[in-house]
Amino acid sequence: MAQSPERTLDEVRVNSIRCRGVLFDLDGVLVDSTPAVARVWTLWARRHGFDPETVVREAHGKPSIATIRELLPNANHEAENKEVERREIEDTDGVIALPGALELLRAIPPEKWAIVTSCTRRLAEVRIGAAGLPNPKRMVTSNDTNNGKPDPEPYLKGAHLLGATGTECVVIEDAPAGIRAGKAAGAHVVALRTTAGDEELRESGADWIVNNCAELSVDPANNGEEYLLLRRRTK
């Protein structure tokens, strides 16, 4: 039997979750932009004398300007951020949809899902287009929030766009910062192994851990039903 939105941790260990909406992170969940992101941040890191590998890791899952503020507290943050974004928008080589992403999005009614990303709106639109994914009816970007992940604000806004509360939604994430944001918003969080290892994902609060969206399926709402049933495929 499908459980109500108010679920305990024990209940979420089963293989289905009843929810009113699904909130997707973009990079590392729906889209693989890793090569492009690495190229842009490697150039930035070398220009400022930082270790590229460390910077690329730190930048994942957070607004670019947050990374810049952390690493260059005395810099012109807006100017640096505009330069990073310009390079990211121009570099879409190798940006592709991740396994199962297109199929899962098509299985969910458009009004029941949203993208919640640390990208700017323009960058998100460019990557969605490059990956050949459908444009979301609802999207929350760094342009829409005062506080980025791991703050819950982005996911709370995403839930609101779906006419739901955080506790009524499932968040699908890959980054520890995003997982913490989803949990802080009250959502159940499905973590993908596209970026971090299982231990780090669990420590961040993930309820489920799967390889990619191909391991998830949805029984869609029918005839005006409010809820979806998100399932985890079992072997």
How would you name each of these model-derived features?
Residues 32, 115-117, 191:
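Hydrophobic residues in well-ordered beta-strands that form the structural core
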Residues 43-46, 115, 210:
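Intrinsic disorder/low-complexity segments enriched in polar/charged and small flexible residues
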Residues 4-110, 120-122, 133:
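N-terminal helical cap/lid subdomain that shapes the substrate entry/recognition surface
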Residues 97, 116, 147:
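Residue-level marker of regulatory loop/turn positions in helix-turn-helix DNA-binding domains and
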Residues 1-20, 112, 121-235:
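Asp-based, Mg2+/Mn2+-dependent phosphohydrolase catalytic module
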